[in-house]
């Protein structure tokens, strides 16, 4: 993939990630002045995950590092705009949730219950379930670590 096509793919990915970030921010009753920042943070998070995956990271580690980035930026923006960090961060990580692998795991479970046990369906179910669980865990841990680092009251030593 050439550099120009990669930049266009990255811009498309970031633009398409900003749309659900704004949509979920509206569902969560985020103030109107913060909607553009939710969109920007969702685009930054999804774009950074795409860059890391293109560099060879697997999706779980790329998601974890992108969630760390989103959490850190969200805390900084919350100080600038005098708002809670969750206003920016929760809606921004929604585009990184593992919809396809969770859906594939659920379809595999339904097929196993309908057609009976088969080894390939069970492997598909377990691999997609573990992948989706790992991504959700990476998102939750990645969002919580910056708050633990930056809001620490006691000295680190």
Swiss-Prot record:
GO BP term, pick one: succinate transport
Topology versus the membrane: Multi-pass membrane protein
InterPro entries: ThrE_2 (IPR024528), ThrE_Dicarb/AminoAcid_Exp (IPR050539), YjjB (IPR020914)
Keywords in alphabetical order: Cell inner membrane, Cell membrane, Membrane, Transmembrane, Transmembrane helix, Transport
A Pfam family the protein falls into: ThrE_2
Main location: membrane
GO cellular component, as recorded: plasma membrane
Keyword Membrane: yes
Transmembrane segments annotated in the record for this chain: 2-22, 55-75, 87-107, 129-149
Subcellular location: Cell inner membrane
Keyword Cell membrane found: yes
Disulfide bonds: none
Subunit and partners: The transporter is composed of YjjB and YjjP.
HAMAP family: YjjB (MF_01191)
Family: Belongs to the ThrE exporter (TC 2.A.79) family.
Annotated function: Involved in succinate export with YjjP. Both proteins are required for export.
Full protein name: Probable succinate transporter subunit YjjB
Gene this protein is translated from: yjjB
């Amino acid at each position: 993939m050439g550099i120009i096509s990669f930049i266009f793919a990255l811009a498309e990915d970031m633009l398409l990630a900003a749309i659900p970030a704004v949509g979920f921010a509206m569902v969560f009753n985020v103030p109107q002045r913060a909607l553009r920042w939710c969109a920007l943070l969702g685009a930054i998070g999804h774009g950074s995950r795409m860059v890391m995956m293109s560099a060879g990271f697997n999706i779980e580690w790329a998601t974890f590092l992108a969630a760390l980035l989103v959490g850190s930026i969200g805390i900084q923006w919350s100080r600038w705009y005098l708002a809670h960090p969750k206003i920016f961060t929760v809606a921004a990580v929604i585009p990184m949730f593992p919809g396809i692998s969770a859906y594939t795991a659920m379809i595999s479970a339904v097929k196993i219950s309908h057609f009976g046990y088969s080894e390939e369906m069970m492997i598909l179910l377990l691999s997609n379930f573990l992948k989706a669980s790992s991504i959700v865990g990476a998102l939750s841990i990645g969002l919580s670590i910056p708050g633990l680092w930056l809001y620490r009251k006691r000295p680190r030593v």
